Amino acid sequence: MKPLVIGETYRTQGRTIGEGDVSLFAGLVGDFTPIHVDETFAATSPHGTRIAHGPLSMSMAIGMATLTGLFGARVIGLVNINWDFGGVVKLGDTIRAEVTVEALRPSSKPGRAVATYGLRVFNQTGAEIQAGRMVVVVRAD
């Protein structure tokens, strides 16, 4: 594993959110809120169409960050997550993320450290739509 470097930023590839993603997520978590699954209802909303669940796009951003090799085998467990949903993700939108190593400190347990990651999520126009922080227990490098 490449050592974590405070201030280093990783950029993910993009991923387009589709019908299957929203349907599967709704079924998995049991959230069938009309704004996500009912186009007729959603057409009358301020968004004019259905939007993806906020936690779906957050989870996809974290998953895309995992594909950079930043997390993987080094992760022991999630301590905390704090997330802001500043914009919506419509079906057909493509999101990407940037992840920055913000802090790294030793854990009280040998061989472990506590890493803080800042994440920013952007849509296909480059607008920031979500941002958050994750605190994760990791294997010490």
Map each language-model feature to its residues.
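Catalytic strand-loop segment that frames the active site of acyl-thioester-processing enzymes
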Residues: 1-52, 138-140
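A generic structural signal for short beta-strands and their flanking turns/coil linkers
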Residues: 6-8, 13, 21, 31, ...
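Hydrophobic beta-strand-centered segment that forms part of the acyl-chain substrate-binding groove
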Residues: 43-52, 56-102
